[in-house]
Amino acid sequence: MSRKILVLPGDGIGPEITREAVKILNACREAGLEASIEEGLVGGAGIDAHGVPLPDETLASAKAADAVLLGAVGGPQWDKIEDLSKRPEKGLLGLRKNLNLFGNLRPALLYPQLASASSLKPEIVAGLDIMIVRELTGGIYFGQPRGIEERDGERVGYNTYIYAEHEIERIGRVAFEMARERGGKLCSVDKANVLEATILWREVMERLAPEYPDVALSHMYVDNAAMQLVRAPKQFDVIVTGNMFGDILSDAAAMLTGSIGMLPSASLNEQRQGMYEPCHGSAPDIAGQGIANPLATILSVAMMLRYSLEAPQLAERIERAVGTVLDQGLRTADIAFEGTAPVSTQAMGDAVLAAFQAQ
């Protein structure tokens, strides 16, 4: 069965890094992957061409696709747009909402070749391999009511932190399944000593636990989890948490690895349709210079093959190819050591392609 892949380069460095990832996708097709590749506009590119960050044709193509590969959205040229619903980032949020992408997978994996690039001592982070499972469509980012209004002569801003049982249960199942496939440890992060919504979160996680007797469930308050990620990160295997806490913790975990330019992500719905993107942003300050790191986007393709396209062997080939290139000493500027000459975006992509094809 032929699969459909939609590529959305987006803004900033997005077109440069997705170009390298598409090379790898085409190599996968040559290796037997039955898939068609289509390209579309999103974010600032959508605004410039159609006046909206998520054009109708892009959304229609995304709904028809098995997987979406996104580069990055946003840039200073669109920061003056006063209507927040017309900002580039709303294109990303619109895709998440319309595709019902409730589960976000953010690996924090330290490649041994890059251990010295971490901000922590090598002995603390060596062998680090964490998967953060973040609920993506509920919580305080989407809760109603919300707004800014006048009360008693002053402006008041308010938001609603809300989770329904079914939202917690479905992300919980994703996390338990992930822990079962990995090291068998799941840490649920909440703030159940203060927030009723996360008291319910903890109750639902506890209720699911007997269905997964091979997974050891623990709980941690989010403030302690942030501290433990820096103090002793290797205690974690899989972390599951809500939208806001996951947003913060996954970025903190990302920097344990030395470069956010190495880290992919996946956002899935219940049918395993997914959107795959690097964890980094559009980096407008280096856009067009050919120096961006494409590895996070290439590794996002590996996640796509594993979780949406049922091609885990090809995913492993990509991951091995990235390891080979790092073994060869090739580094883009963000992961280059002092005294080493960084390679270009294209050179890094070509090297991964060669290592992939050599297997």
UniProtKB/Swiss-Prot annotation:
Record carries keyword Membrane: no
Cofactor(s) annotated in UniProt: Mg(2+); Mn(2+)
Group of enzyme by EC: oxidoreductase
Gene3D superfamilies associated with the record: Isopropylmalate Dehydrogenase
KW RNA-binding (keyword) present: no
SMART domains named among the record's database cross-references: Iso_dh
E.C. designation(s): 1.1.1.85
Keywords noted in UniProt: Amino-acid biosynthesis, Branched-chain amino acid biosynthesis, Cytoplasm, Leucine biosynthesis, Magnesium, Manganese, Metal-binding, NAD, Oxidoreductase
Residues given in the record as Mg(2+) binding sites: D223, D247, D251
InterPro entries: IsoCit/isopropylmalate_DH_CS (IPR019818), IsoPropMal-DH-like_dom (IPR024084), Isopropylmalate_DH (IPR004429)
Protein name: 3-isopropylmalate dehydrogenase
Gene: leuB
